């Protein structure tokens, strides 16, 4: 039985963002129920050993809020977190690794390109490589993460390339891991070996291709990029000068948006994650939320758990 916990459902900056006075953030400053931390998920085949999908800057807060990730009773030093699988090298995917520097063993699984980014930044040397192994993963190659003692996790993982872009802080620079598009943005298919049930996780996706549709069709659970409702959302709101596409994110709405593109794929359960604080879908009373839910999508709160 596979368990998935949404540790954080927001995009970079969280909800509310510390310096943002947009309508969603103002509402979230006033109402705790609207608040969301930056995107990360945890998945487990046995309920005892967990793998993070990305390490959010809010990781410590997320661990505190998630009993499944607490140290076991009676142990002086312990964590149920056995590893972290990175889907990209963005700040909001890797910064939480720095909160895991206190000496518990775990593994980092990432494309060689992302591992090169970590290696090039000496701040990540606080993660003792004798305890924190760095394991390269290749696209379209199945692997099974292991527990710190070498035991197999019971999860099969396949990473696949997704239309997107490289980390924004490397724009215009030579990338430590090379400039090829492969590895910049990954989706994950995670399968419980005992039951055969699979989930698909895409925290960033610029467009839905025919190949991606074929991969997601009939899935029991998809967690999908919900950064913006409209492609020009940040521009229209006066919050920025980039479209969603320019940032590597498909819009939820529109003829070519995620809701339309994934609407006829017979996906049993669809959750939006990595939702930007500009996105009105975060407001439960909004027309955008009503439209998303009518189309079969869920806007999860932090801590939402799904069992397959």
From Swiss-Prot:
SUPFAM superfamilies: Metallo-hydrolase/oxidoreductase. Pfam families: Lactamase_B_2. The keyword Transport applies. The keyword Metal-binding does not apply. Transmembrane segments: none annotated. Keywords: PQQ biosynthesis, Transport. GO terms for biological process: pyrroloquinoline quinone biosynthetic process. InterPro entries: Metallo-B-lactamas (IPR001279), PQQ_synth_PqqB (IPR011842), RibonucZ/Hydroxyglut_hydro (IPR036866). It comes from the Bacteria. Pathway: Cofactor biosynthesis; pyrroloquinoline quinone biosynthesis. Belongs to the PqqB family. May be involved in the transport of PQQ or its precursor to the periplasm. NCBIfam families: PQQ_syn_pqqB. This is Coenzyme PQQ synthesis protein B.
